[in-house]
Amino acid sequence: MQIESAAPSPAPFVPDDFQIPAGLETAEFRLRMLTVNDVVKDFEAVVTSAEHLKQVFPGGTWPDGLTMEQDLIDLGWHQKEFQRRTSFAYTVVTLSESRVLGCVYVCPTDKRGYDAAVFLWARQSELAGGLEERLAGAVKQWIAQEWPFRSVAYPGRGMAWEEYEKLPSKKR
């Protein structure tokens, strides 16, 4: 999934001296940096969750037509953005690291009133058990406690995508 900020900010997304959280671990799952080494498990999670992903990220056709090669390119992009501190993609894995359960994206936003936007998804097979709601709750708490943001948007979670898209830009 390619999550792009609408426009680069003249200020860094996070302060230069901010220590980026390595991840989050609960009794159920672990978040850690998404890397190219996750491609096989990530690809399987994405393609088996395609219908759900089109609901989580409306208005597009992703991940229709995604190949493992394209997923590898996407993961490399996310990994490089993480290293450059311009956005942060975390894979959500089981504690044994045997399965990818979803992803969390912490991104800059150009929306006035917000200094970050967080997007997340859980694999379709885990929805009935409530994983996505538990993941969202844990991530919101983690962001509030560990990250330097004052105001975070969660499009599609407490704020409709349509509402988020209509927010004025910081540039206007």
Task: Give short role names for the model-derived ranges.
Residues 2-126, 137-138, 142-172:
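GNAT-family acyltransferases
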Residues 131:
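ATP-dependent phospho-/nucleotidyl transfer catalytic cores
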